[in-house]
């Protein structure tokens, strides 16, 4: 939910890490 608004295009994205 935290990474829904974030663009998970890069594995180094801190937002993507929180979305997993």
From Swiss-Prot:
The keyword Disulfide bond applies. Disulfide bonds join 6-15, 8-16. One of its GO terms (molecular function) is toxin activity. It is found in: Secreted. Its main location: secreted. Residues 1-20 form the Disintegrin domain. InterPro entries: Disintegrin_dom_sf. Expressed by the venom gland. Keywords: Cell adhesion impairing toxin, Disulfide bond, Hemostasis impairing toxin, Platelet aggregation inhibiting toxin, Secreted, Toxin. GO terms for cellular component: extracellular region. Inhibits fibrinogen interaction with platelets. Acts by binding to alpha-IIb/beta-3 (ITGA2B/ITGB3) on the platelet surface and inhibits aggregation induced by ADP, thrombin, platelet-activating factor and collagen. The disintegrin belongs to the medium disintegrin subfamily. Belongs to the venom metalloproteinase (M12B) family. P-II subfamily. P-IIa sub-subfamily. Monomer. This is Disintegrin. It comes from Bothrops fonsecai (Fonseca's lancehead). The lineage of its organism: Eukaryota, Metazoa, Chordata, Craniata, Vertebrata.
């Amino acid at each position: 939910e935290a990474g829904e608004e974030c663009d998970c295009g890069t594995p180094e994205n801190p937002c993507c890490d929180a979305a997993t």
